[in-house]
Structures are given as structure tokens and as C-alpha cells.
């Protein structure tokens, strides 16, 4: 069985967010690095750094949390895996979905690399829908 690195990064971030952890360590691949760059640029995570341990590279992510101590903990963002190894989901440039009317983002894997839905609309290309973030 192969490993689904996109599902692993989404699950790790979601579990750390629900457990109120501030730091997450995930394995570093080209796909995860590109997704983390998008999350940094869009403001969903505070910081990311590359860490090497026993000839393996890891990404250490610092998550954004509310600093208010009163009231219940609220998850800062939600992530949902859409296309998976058993069922690939594609969208052309005319059928790119909008999440919460443009408040969330869709991460695409295109022929020009991994990008958000806004970038794919501007370039007029479609691709595989990796995940929704809102």
C-alpha cells in the first residue's frame, strides 16, 4: 500500500488543532512543502521550518490559535481531503468550486504545480482538487 502524503498532512494538522497543540511535525516531501507554502501565504499557519533528523527531513509547523482564554476552544480552520488515491476528483477551469463564497481556499494540483483556486482561475487552468480549507 502506498502512502497518501496529502491525507497525512491534513490529518496531522487537524488533530493538532483539535488537541490545542501549537506545533506539528510532518514528513517533508515536495507536495507537502508546496501545500505548507500555500498555508503560510494564506495565513492559516504562523511559521514553518525544515528540520533534519537521522537523514530524514521534517517540516515543523507552528499553528495559529486564538489567544483568548475564556470560552470554548474554537478550531481556527477546517481541512477536508477531496481527491484521494481510490477516487480522483478533477475540475476544469470553468468548474473550479468556491468555498464559503470565496472565504475558503481550494488547493489544486495542476500541470503548473500546486496552487490555490484563485491562482488557477487567473491562469485559466484546472486540475486535481487536493483539499478544501476554510
Curated annotation (Swiss-Prot):
Pfam families: Ribosomal_S8. The keyword Cell membrane does not apply. InterPro entries: Ribosomal_uS8, Ribosomal_uS8_sf. GO terms for cellular component: chloroplast; ribonucleoprotein complex; ribosome. Keywords: Chloroplast, Plastid, Ribonucleoprotein, Ribosomal protein, RNA-binding, rRNA-binding. GO terms for molecular function: rRNA binding; structural constituent of ribosome. The keyword Plastid applies. It is found in: Plastid, Chloroplast. One of its GO terms (biological process) is translation. HAMAP family: Ribosomal_uS8_B. One of the primary rRNA binding proteins, it binds directly to 16S rRNA central domain where it helps coordinate assembly of the platform of the 30S subunit. Part of the 30S ribosomal subunit. Belongs to the universal ribosomal protein uS8 family. This is Small ribosomal subunit protein uS8c. It comes from Coffea arabica.
